[in-house]
Amino acid sequence: AYRNIRTCIECGVAAVSGTTGWTDRLGELQELCRERGGALFYASNYCLGVNLMFRLNRQLAAMIDRVGGYDVRIEEVHHTQKKDAPSGTAITLAEGIVENLAGKQGWVNLAPGIEHAANRIERSGEAPADRIEIRSVREGAVPGIHTVTYESEDDVLEIRHTIKNRRTLALGAVVAAEFLCGKQGVYSMDDLLRNA
């Protein structure tokens, strides 16, 4: 994906990317956009509802940090053809929690036989206390379900998003492309939602 995005920017074509696994090189693409007057819009998920969940998730993590007494975990469910785990959406949710909840330093995916290279601890069983457990499930033709669960000794608080069909992903990508028209620089769904 990185090479394709770079080629688009070098050729003067605005790029809209929904792939993950390349954002460790985002700084290089930001510099290239500055040098070439290029434009890039990237998101781990183009569903507008998921992106609202990302914002809610960050805010909730900050509130839980102030209140204390809760642990957090994430579950993501996708169709059996999805090869990566955890999903980019689950990783984005985990990153939002790590940024706002003291004591969480990263995440661990406990799905046996499904791997993701970034920020993974090889482990089975329970997640270490300083990591967010991400459980990946692959079943049927599920387009995507993401659940963030905060649990204390006394209660459970969940936020959940279910994609009913993939049309919403295409719609979000079109909205992002329209937003990018006439712009230079690097943008994300936060920029789009901030200007909505």
Model-derived regions, located:
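Rossmann-fold NAD(P)-binding glycine/threonine-rich loop
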Residues: 1-11, 18-43, 48-62
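A generic structural signal for short
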Residues: 17-18, 82
